[in-house]
Protein backbone atom coordinates (compact mmCIF):
# COMPACT_ATOMS: atom_id res chain seq x y z
CA UNK A 1 0.00 0.00 0.00
CA UNK A 2 1.25 3.48 -0.89
CA UNK A 3 2.30 5.40 2.24
CA UNK A 4 3.22 8.80 0.76
CA UNK A 5 0.49 11.14 2.00
CA UNK A 6 0.37 13.30 -1.14
CA UNK A 7 -1.38 12.05 -4.28
CA UNK A 8 1.04 11.94 -7.22
CA UNK A 9 -0.40 12.57 -10.70
CA UNK A 10 1.65 12.27 -13.90
CA UNK A 11 0.69 14.34 -16.93
CA UNK A 12 2.25 15.40 -20.20
CA UNK A 13 4.78 18.20 -19.79
CA UNK A 14 3.77 20.19 -22.87
CA UNK A 15 1.46 20.06 -25.83
CA UNK A 16 -2.29 20.04 -26.39
CA UNK A 17 -2.94 17.20 -23.95
CA UNK A 18 -0.98 19.07 -21.29
CA UNK A 19 -3.04 22.23 -21.78
CA UNK A 20 -6.32 20.32 -21.63
CA UNK A 21 -5.21 18.33 -18.56
CA UNK A 22 -4.33 21.57 -16.78
CA UNK A 23 -7.72 23.03 -17.64
CA UNK A 24 -9.46 19.91 -16.28
CA UNK A 25 -7.59 20.18 -12.96
CA UNK A 26 -8.50 23.86 -12.78
CA UNK A 27 -12.17 23.12 -13.40
CA UNK A 28 -12.01 20.46 -10.66
CA UNK A 29 -10.84 23.10 -8.19
CA UNK A 30 -7.19 22.04 -7.98
CA UNK A 31 -5.18 25.23 -7.49
CA UNK A 32 -1.74 24.71 -8.94
CA UNK A 33 0.85 26.80 -10.76
CA UNK A 34 2.04 24.90 -13.83
CA UNK A 35 3.83 27.80 -15.50
CA UNK A 36 7.49 27.48 -16.44
CA UNK A 37 9.62 24.36 -16.76
CA UNK A 38 9.17 22.85 -13.30
CA UNK A 39 9.03 19.04 -13.44
CA UNK A 40 7.08 18.82 -10.17
CA UNK A 41 4.34 21.24 -9.13
CA UNK A 42 2.41 21.27 -5.87
CA UNK A 43 -1.29 22.01 -5.38
CA UNK A 44 -2.00 24.88 -3.02
CA UNK A 45 -5.31 23.62 -1.64
CA UNK A 46 -5.08 19.81 -1.83
CA UNK A 47 -2.36 17.22 -1.04
CA UNK A 48 -1.55 16.67 -4.73
CA UNK A 49 1.78 16.67 -6.58
CA UNK A 50 1.87 16.96 -10.38
CA UNK A 51 4.75 15.28 -12.23
CA UNK A 52 5.24 16.75 -15.72
CA UNK A 53 6.89 14.16 -17.96
CA UNK A 54 7.02 12.86 -21.54
CA UNK A 55 3.72 11.30 -22.54
CA UNK A 56 5.23 7.90 -23.34
CA UNK A 57 6.73 7.73 -19.82
CA UNK A 58 3.36 8.07 -18.09
CA UNK A 59 2.04 4.49 -18.54
CA UNK A 60 5.24 2.98 -17.11
CA UNK A 61 5.18 5.32 -14.11
CA UNK A 62 1.65 4.11 -13.31
CA UNK A 63 2.35 0.43 -14.11
CA UNK A 64 5.41 0.47 -11.84
CA UNK A 65 3.64 2.31 -9.02
CA UNK A 66 5.89 5.38 -9.13
CA UNK A 67 2.82 7.65 -9.35
CA UNK A 68 -0.76 7.11 -8.25
CA UNK A 69 -2.62 8.51 -11.25
CA UNK A 70 -1.84 9.35 -14.86
CA UNK A 71 -3.60 11.40 -17.52
CA UNK A 72 -2.63 9.89 -20.84
CA UNK A 73 -3.84 9.30 -24.39
CA UNK A 74 -5.33 5.85 -24.94
CA UNK A 75 -3.04 5.38 -27.95
CA UNK A 76 0.11 5.84 -25.83
CA UNK A 77 -1.31 3.71 -23.02
CA UNK A 78 -2.21 0.78 -25.25
CA UNK A 79 1.04 0.96 -27.24
CA UNK A 80 3.05 0.66 -24.01
CA UNK A 81 0.77 -2.09 -22.71
CA UNK A 82 1.25 -4.12 -25.91
CA UNK A 83 5.02 -3.51 -25.83
CA UNK A 84 5.35 -4.77 -22.26
CA UNK A 85 3.07 -7.73 -22.87
CA UNK A 86 5.13 -8.74 -25.92
CA UNK A 87 8.26 -8.63 -23.74
CA UNK A 88 6.62 -10.83 -21.10
CA UNK A 89 6.45 -8.02 -18.54
CA UNK A 90 3.54 -7.64 -16.14
CA UNK A 91 1.05 -4.85 -16.82
CA UNK A 92 -1.25 -3.77 -14.00
CA UNK A 93 -3.36 -0.64 -13.66
CA UNK A 94 -6.94 0.53 -13.20
CA UNK A 95 -8.84 2.41 -15.88
CA UNK A 96 -10.77 5.08 -13.97
CA UNK A 97 -12.38 7.19 -16.66
CA UNK A 98 -12.25 8.14 -20.31
CA UNK A 99 -11.92 11.91 -20.62
CA UNK A 100 -13.68 14.07 -23.18
CA UNK A 101 -10.58 15.64 -24.70
CA UNK A 102 -7.39 14.69 -26.51
CA UNK A 103 -9.28 13.09 -29.36
CA UNK A 104 -7.20 11.82 -32.29
CA UNK A 105 -6.98 8.90 -34.67
CA UNK A 106 -4.16 6.62 -35.77
CA UNK A 107 -4.36 6.18 -39.53
CA UNK A 108 -2.64 4.63 -42.49
CA UNK A 109 -1.57 7.11 -45.17
CA UNK A 110 -0.02 6.70 -48.61
CA UNK A 111 1.20 8.98 -51.40
CA UNK A 112 -1.70 11.01 -52.75
CA UNK A 113 -1.31 9.48 -56.23
CA UNK A 114 -1.29 5.86 -54.98
CA UNK A 115 -4.47 3.82 -55.44
CA UNK A 116 -5.61 2.19 -52.18
CA UNK A 117 -8.03 -0.76 -52.19
CA UNK A 118 -7.91 -1.70 -48.52
CA UNK A 119 -5.16 -2.88 -46.14
CA UNK A 120 -4.26 -5.73 -48.49
CA UNK A 121 -2.89 -3.06 -50.85
CA UNK A 122 0.00 -2.73 -48.38
CA UNK A 123 0.95 -6.40 -48.41
CA UNK A 124 4.74 -6.75 -47.95
CA UNK A 125 5.13 -2.95 -47.93
CA UNK A 126 7.30 -0.91 -45.59
CA UNK A 127 5.20 1.14 -43.16
CA UNK A 128 6.82 3.83 -41.02
CA UNK A 129 5.27 4.48 -37.61
CA UNK A 130 5.82 5.54 -34.01
CA UNK A 131 3.21 2.97 -32.92
CA UNK A 132 4.59 -0.40 -34.06
CA UNK A 133 2.53 -2.53 -31.67
CA UNK A 134 -0.84 -0.98 -32.55
CA UNK A 135 0.06 -1.26 -36.24
CA UNK A 136 1.23 -4.86 -35.84
CA UNK A 137 -2.01 -5.83 -34.10
CA UNK A 138 -4.17 -4.20 -36.76
CA UNK A 139 -2.30 -5.73 -39.71
CA UNK A 140 -2.38 -9.15 -38.04
CA UNK A 141 -6.16 -8.83 -37.66
CA UNK A 142 -6.34 -8.04 -41.39
CA UNK A 143 -4.02 -10.92 -42.25
CA UNK A 144 -1.65 -8.62 -44.13
CA UNK A 145 2.15 -9.14 -43.92
CA UNK A 146 4.28 -5.97 -43.82
CA UNK A 147 7.60 -4.57 -42.62
CA UNK A 148 7.50 -2.06 -39.77
CA UNK A 149 9.89 0.92 -39.88
CA UNK A 150 10.16 2.53 -36.44
CA UNK A 151 10.47 6.32 -36.43
CA UNK A 152 10.06 8.50 -33.34
CA UNK A 153 9.31 11.71 -35.21
CA UNK A 154 8.67 13.24 -38.64
CA UNK A 155 6.98 10.03 -39.76
CA UNK A 156 5.21 11.84 -42.59
CA UNK A 157 8.48 12.45 -44.50
CA UNK A 158 9.34 8.73 -44.70
CA UNK A 159 7.77 7.98 -48.11
CA UNK A 160 9.41 10.94 -49.87
CA UNK A 161 12.72 10.11 -48.22
CA UNK A 162 12.49 6.58 -49.61
CA UNK A 163 12.34 5.05 -46.13
CA UNK A 164 8.84 3.60 -46.43
CA UNK A 165 5.98 2.93 -48.83
CA UNK A 166 3.32 4.17 -46.39
CA UNK A 167 2.99 5.53 -42.88
CA UNK A 168 0.84 4.93 -39.81
CA UNK A 169 0.59 8.11 -37.76
CA UNK A 170 -1.68 10.26 -35.62
CA UNK A 171 -4.02 12.50 -37.58
CA UNK A 172 -6.03 15.50 -36.42
CA UNK A 173 -7.01 17.64 -39.40
CA UNK A 174 -4.97 15.93 -42.11
CA UNK A 175 -3.21 19.17 -43.03
CA UNK A 176 0.26 17.78 -42.24
CA UNK A 177 -0.36 14.75 -44.45
CA UNK A 178 -1.54 16.92 -47.32
CA UNK A 179 1.49 19.21 -46.97
CA UNK A 180 3.71 16.16 -47.43
CA UNK A 181 1.85 14.78 -50.44
CA UNK A 182 0.04 12.06 -48.47
CA UNK A 183 -3.59 11.04 -48.08
CA UNK A 184 -5.30 9.31 -45.17
CA UNK A 185 -6.73 5.97 -46.29
CA UNK A 186 -7.62 3.91 -43.21
CA UNK A 187 -8.29 4.68 -39.54
CA UNK A 188 -6.91 1.85 -37.40
CA UNK A 189 -7.42 3.28 -33.90
CA UNK A 190 -9.40 6.12 -32.29
CA UNK A 191 -8.15 7.62 -29.05
CA UNK A 192 -9.07 10.05 -26.29
CA UNK A 193 -7.36 10.98 -23.06
CA UNK A 194 -8.03 8.80 -20.03
CA UNK A 195 -7.34 8.74 -16.31
CA UNK A 196 -5.58 5.64 -14.96
CA UNK A 197 -4.59 4.53 -11.45
CA UNK A 198 -1.87 2.26 -10.12
CA UNK A 199 -3.01 -1.27 -9.28
CA UNK A 200 -1.53 -1.30 -5.78
CA UNK A 201 -4.14 -0.15 -3.20
CA UNK A 202 -3.86 3.44 -2.03
CA UNK A 203 -4.14 4.62 1.53
CA UNK A 204 -7.65 5.41 2.74
CA UNK A 205 -6.92 9.16 2.61
CA UNK A 206 -5.54 8.99 -0.93
CA UNK A 207 -8.41 6.86 -2.21
CA UNK A 208 -10.91 9.30 -0.72
CA UNK A 209 -9.16 12.11 -2.60
CA UNK A 210 -9.22 10.10 -5.85
CA UNK A 211 -12.95 9.50 -5.39
CA UNK A 212 -13.49 13.23 -4.82
CA UNK A 213 -11.56 14.08 -7.99
CA UNK A 214 -13.56 11.52 -10.00
CA UNK A 215 -16.83 13.04 -8.77
CA UNK A 216 -15.63 16.49 -9.80
CA UNK A 217 -14.50 15.24 -13.22
CA UNK A 218 -17.92 13.69 -13.73
CA UNK A 219 -19.51 17.02 -12.83
CA UNK A 220 -17.26 18.93 -15.23
CA UNK A 221 -17.92 16.52 -18.11
CA UNK A 222 -21.66 16.45 -17.49
CA UNK A 223 -21.66 20.24 -17.51
CA UNK A 224 -19.76 20.29 -20.81
CA UNK A 225 -22.34 17.94 -22.33
CA UNK A 226 -25.38 19.76 -20.91
CA UNK A 227 -27.22 23.04 -21.38
CA UNK A 228 -29.53 24.97 -19.07
CA UNK A 229 -32.69 25.86 -20.97
CA UNK A 230 -35.28 28.43 -19.95
CA UNK A 231 -38.44 29.30 -21.84
CA UNK A 232 -42.06 30.40 -21.51
CA UNK A 233 -44.68 27.84 -22.53
CA UNK A 234 -48.48 27.99 -22.96
CA UNK A 235 -50.09 25.79 -20.31
CA UNK A 236 -52.12 23.88 -22.90
CA UNK A 237 -48.93 23.01 -24.85
CA UNK A 238 -46.72 22.23 -21.85
CA UNK A 239 -46.62 18.45 -22.33
CA UNK A 240 -45.76 18.73 -26.02
CA UNK A 241 -43.03 21.30 -25.36
CA UNK A 242 -41.35 19.40 -22.50
CA UNK A 243 -41.35 16.26 -24.68
CA UNK A 244 -38.92 18.10 -26.98
CA UNK A 245 -36.50 18.71 -24.09
CA UNK A 246 -35.03 15.45 -22.73
CA UNK A 247 -33.51 16.42 -19.39
CA UNK A 248 -31.37 15.06 -16.59
CA UNK A 249 -34.44 15.27 -14.35
CA UNK A 250 -38.02 16.48 -14.68
CA UNK A 251 -38.28 20.15 -15.67
CA UNK A 252 -38.99 22.88 -13.14
CA UNK A 253 -42.32 24.58 -13.84
CA UNK A 254 -42.85 28.08 -12.41
CA UNK A 255 -45.82 30.48 -12.64
CA UNK A 256 -45.42 33.73 -14.56
CA UNK A 257 -46.39 37.05 -13.03
CA UNK A 258 -49.38 38.73 -14.68
CA UNK A 259 -49.96 35.87 -17.16
CA UNK A 260 -52.15 32.92 -16.19
CA UNK A 261 -51.93 31.32 -19.63
CA UNK A 262 -48.20 30.57 -19.57
CA UNK A 263 -45.57 29.07 -17.25
CA UNK A 264 -41.78 29.28 -17.10
CA UNK A 265 -39.95 26.03 -17.86
CA UNK A 266 -36.39 25.40 -16.65
CA UNK A 267 -34.57 22.19 -17.59
CA UNK A 268 -31.02 20.82 -17.76
CA UNK A 269 -30.73 18.98 -21.07
CA UNK A 270 -27.94 16.54 -21.89
CA UNK A 271 -28.62 16.82 -25.61
CA UNK A 272 -27.58 19.69 -27.83
CA UNK A 273 -30.43 22.03 -28.59
CA UNK A 274 -30.17 22.50 -32.33
CA UNK A 275 -31.87 25.23 -34.34
CA UNK A 276 -34.40 22.68 -35.59
CA UNK A 277 -35.48 21.92 -32.02
CA UNK A 278 -35.74 25.60 -31.16
CA UNK A 279 -37.90 26.13 -34.24
CA UNK A 280 -40.14 23.24 -33.14
CA UNK A 281 -40.44 24.83 -29.69
CA UNK A 282 -41.43 28.11 -31.35
CA UNK A 283 -44.08 26.32 -33.43
CA UNK A 284 -45.55 24.86 -30.23
CA UNK A 285 -45.91 28.34 -28.79
CA UNK A 286 -42.73 28.59 -26.70
CA UNK A 287 -41.23 32.06 -26.30
CA UNK A 288 -38.23 33.75 -24.65
CA UNK A 289 -36.11 30.62 -25.24
CA UNK A 290 -32.67 30.87 -23.61
CA UNK A 291 -29.93 28.22 -23.90
CA UNK A 292 -27.09 28.71 -21.41
CA UNK A 293 -23.79 26.86 -20.82
CA UNK A 294 -23.22 25.12 -17.47
CA UNK A 295 -19.87 25.47 -15.72
CA UNK A 296 -20.26 22.75 -13.05
CA UNK A 297 -22.95 20.20 -12.25
CA UNK A 298 -23.52 17.46 -9.68
CA UNK A 299 -26.54 15.42 -10.72
From Swiss-Prot:
Subcellular localization: Cytoplasm
Record GO cellular component, one term: cytoplasm
Stated regulation of activity: Feedback inhibited by histidine.
GO biological process terms, semicolon-separated: L-histidine biosynthetic process
Catalytic activity line of the entry: 1-(5-phospho-beta-D-ribosyl)-ATP + diphosphate = 5-phospho-alpha-D-ribose 1-diphosphate + ATP
Swiss-Prot/TrEMBL keywords: Amino-acid biosynthesis, ATP-binding, Cytoplasm, Glycosyltransferase, Histidine biosynthesis, Magnesium, Metal-binding, Nucleotide-binding, Transferase
Pathway note: Amino-acid biosynthesis; L-histidine biosynthesis; L-histidine from 5-phospho-alpha-D-ribose 1-diphosphate: step 1/9
Gene3D superfamilies, per database record: 3.30.70.120, Periplasmic binding protein-like II
Gene Ontology MF terms in the entry: ATP binding; ATP phosphoribosyltransferase activity; magnesium ion binding
Cofactor(s) demanded: Mg(2+)
Enzyme Commission code(s) on record: 2.4.2.17
InterPro entries: ATP-PRT_HisG_long, ATP_PRibTrfase_cat, ATP_PRibTrfase_CS, ATP_PRibTrfase_HisG, HisG_C, N-reg_PII-like_a/b, N-reg_PII/ATP_PRibTrfase_C
Described purpose of this protein according to its UniProt entry: Catalyzes the condensation of ATP and 5-phosphoribose 1-diphosphate to form N'-(5'-phosphoribosyl)-ATP (PR-ATP). Has a crucial role in the pathway because the rate of histidine biosynthesis seems to be controlled primarily by regulation of HisG enzymatic activity.
Sequence similarity: Belongs to the ATP phosphoribosyltransferase family. Long subfamily.
Descriptive protein name: ATP phosphoribosyltransferase
Species per Swiss-Prot/TrEMBL record: Mannheimia succiniciproducens (strain KCTC 0769BP / MBEL55E)
Taxonomic lineage of the native organism: Bacteria, Pseudomonadati, Pseudomonadota, Gammaproteobacteria, Pasteurellales
